[in-house]
Structures are given as structure tokens and as C-alpha cells.
Regions:
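Acidic, glycine-rich A-domain
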Residues: 1-173
């Protein structure tokens, strides 16, 4: 779904998450063919989020993308069994480091969404004040809608936006 809506150099690309994430071009004419194709991708069941974010930047640099052509969000649909976000040792937080690298190349880092689709874990990989990182859990259409509408907010800002939405106006305390 997301890959098909990407623009420019990112159109029809999805990323495998592993110690060495790769972009893969989505193939197939039907939803069944696409799901089968995605399931055959090289999923190593671990995540180096730093490399994933830098891979997005590499595509932008190689294709001379404008900021408007860049993905607005990196949506990590996961069971949250993420081992760690980086294999590097930086003096600064990996997210701050990657943000700085993006800025050095004239880009803004994409919003990062950790979408926990397995409720057996309550582990999230960001603090409540990290702007540009959202934490969501669940598999409903309303989760998807809220996720798309909260780009570039902190987890707390996103929570308040959801709780203050029309859906919850009927709740009185």
C-alpha cells in the first residue's frame, strides 16, 4: 500500500529490515501476487534503523531528489522485536546523528513511526518527547488513519490529537 503511493525515485519501493536493509521494487499485478512477492524478500528479522534511514538518504542523493520527493515517513510495521537501532558507536544519539547527516545534504529526516502490530509487546523505541517519531499499536483502520494524520508530532502530541478527536468527544468524565 505505502510503496505504491511513494513518489519519484521511491515509487513502488519497500525496504527490508535487517542488519543491511535493502530497497526492493514491488512487483505483481494483483494483491495476492504482491503479497507473495513481499514474503519472498530477504527479511532477516533484525533491524538497523540507522542504516535504513541512511539508505533513504542514499536514494535521494543518487537521484537528486528534492525535499518534496522525499518520503514523509518511515513506517516500521513490526512485532517490536527490534534488537537495536544502530550497529554504529556515535557520541550522540543515533537519531540526532542521522538528522545531522540529512541536514548536511540539505534534507529533513523522515518522520519515523514504530507501528506495533503484535500486542504481546509494549516496547517502544523512543521517548515521549521525540519530535518526528510516533508510537502506535493495533491493526484497525482508525489506527491507520491516526497514523497518517500525525506526521512530525511527538508521541504525546499524537496521543492528545487522537484523544481530542471527534471519536472520543462523547466520553465524559
Amino acid at each position: 500500500y505505502f510503496a505504491e503511493r511513494n513518489k519519484g525515485a521511491y515509487h513502488n519501493l519497500f525496504m527490508t529490515f535487517s542488519g543491511n536493509p535493502q530497497f526492493v521494487e514491488l512487483k505483481g499485478n494483483t494483491i495476492t501476487e504482491k503479497i507473495k512477492f513481499i514474503s519472498r524478500a530477504n527479511w532477516q528479522m533484525n533491524t538497523d534503523l540507522e542504516k535504513a534511514l541512511l539508505k533513504i538518504l542514499d536514494v535521494a542523493i543518487e537521484n537528486h531528489c528534492s525535499q518534496e520527493e522525499m518520503p514523509k515517513s518511515l513506517i516500521i510495521i513490526s512485532d517490536m522485536e527490534i534488537d537495536r537501532c544502530t550497529s554504529q558507536n556515535h557520541r550522540e544519539n543515533f537519531y540526532d546523528y542521522v538528522s545531522r547527516v540529512y541536514e548536511e545534504h540539505g534534507y529533513k529526516i523522515p518522520n519515523v513511526v514504530f507501528w506495533n502490530v503484535n500486542s504481546r509487546h509494549d516496547v517502544f523505541l523512543a521517548d515521549k518527547n521525540r519530535k518526528g517519531v510516533q508510537l502506535v499499536s493495533g491493526q484497525s483502520a482508525s489506527t491507520f488513519k491516526n497514523l497518517i494524520g500525525c506526521v512530525d508530532k511527538t508521541p504525546v502530541e499524537m496521543m492528545y490529537e487522537v484523544l481530542n478527536s471527534e471519536r472520543y468527544q462523547a466520553i465524559q468524565i
